UniProtKB/Swiss-Prot annotation:
UniProt superkingdom: Eukaryota
The protein's name: Cell surface GPI-anchored protein ARB_01627
Lineage: Eukaryota, Fungi, Dikarya, Ascomycota, Pezizomycotina
Region forming the signal peptide: 1-19
Bilayer topology annotation: Lipid-anchor; GPI-anchor
Amino acid sequence: MAITKYLVSALAVAGLAFAKDCAGDLTIENQQDVSTLSSCEKWDGDIVISEVVKSSISLTGVKQITGSLKAKNSSITELSAPNLNSIGDALSLSTCTALRSLDLSSLTKVKTLSLEALPKLQALGFTRTVSQATSILITNTDLTSLQGLDLETVGDFMVTNNPHLMEINVNKMTNITGYLNFAANNKQLSVKFPNLEGAHNMTFRNVSDASLPSLHKMDGLLGFYSNFFMNISAPNLTATGDLVFTSNSAVMNISMPKLETVKGGLQLANNSLLEDIEGFPALKLITGALDITGKFKTVKLPSLKEVRGDANLQSTETFGCDPWQKLKDSDVIRGKLTCRERQEKPKTGDDHSGGDEEGHKGAAAAFAKAPAAALLIAFVGALQFFL
């Protein structure tokens, strides 16, 4: 009995010692510091790569980090953790301008992924693919694709200022609960979400293709700004918040055949090759403002029953204002109607302050939010190179 008690006590003490040795916040300044992890499959705390590191670091053995794995302003050249499969909090690599190789070949789960100002990093190094993450930020890298990300759902998904990023294809993603923003990547960037069914806010800027064949419902803004595609389609979209198409210089066709409700404003502005606006045959309700300006010759919304805000239609061409006046006279358009043909400089609505009892404001304010956020993210990302 005494021997049994002794063994139990010894094992308990050993367990506590082991737990203590594999816990806390660890700062790594060289490869020798990694020896602290040599007997730890699980590290309970954060691991931080110091700014003084100027070579490669290999975290062999550790399989799980309950906290974060971080590096900021470090001169690390290679980071390897081939056995690491889970990071409980953040994988954050920021302003590591010498980092050229990332090997996290077993990683499948991380809470937040943040890769910022990594100008030499060309591949993610997620061989098994990361399938769980709540937030992703990738900005100012040399990545050519996002191969290694295979998420089904995500919160925020920000990808900006990656000059060689040519393709984003997230096959399994079905839902985006936060804000998605793609901006200022390679001009040939093709974005494909073949199975995405729902999203909160999404903005696409400077992309050559955006494929959303399964998108069914948006809760917030769906915006397309300064893109290079000729055609854009969301064949299964039935409802969205604000819907914006601005300064898409090559677009000639917009098709959303099942869209019935815009809970906010609908704006099409400065799409210089868009002559015929006929891609919304089922649209019935716009709770905010309707704002269409450009060089269009045709506007057809045959199912429209209600516009709760103002309606502004201005074109350099003749498109016919009589049908719109009839909609105003029949109270389909609840706010102010501005309809002008053959305008040298068509103007967008100055103050689309319409909306419904739920507080949906008109186009002008809502349309400005996402572009401003995108520009701020892009600016902050670029600024990191100089800090």
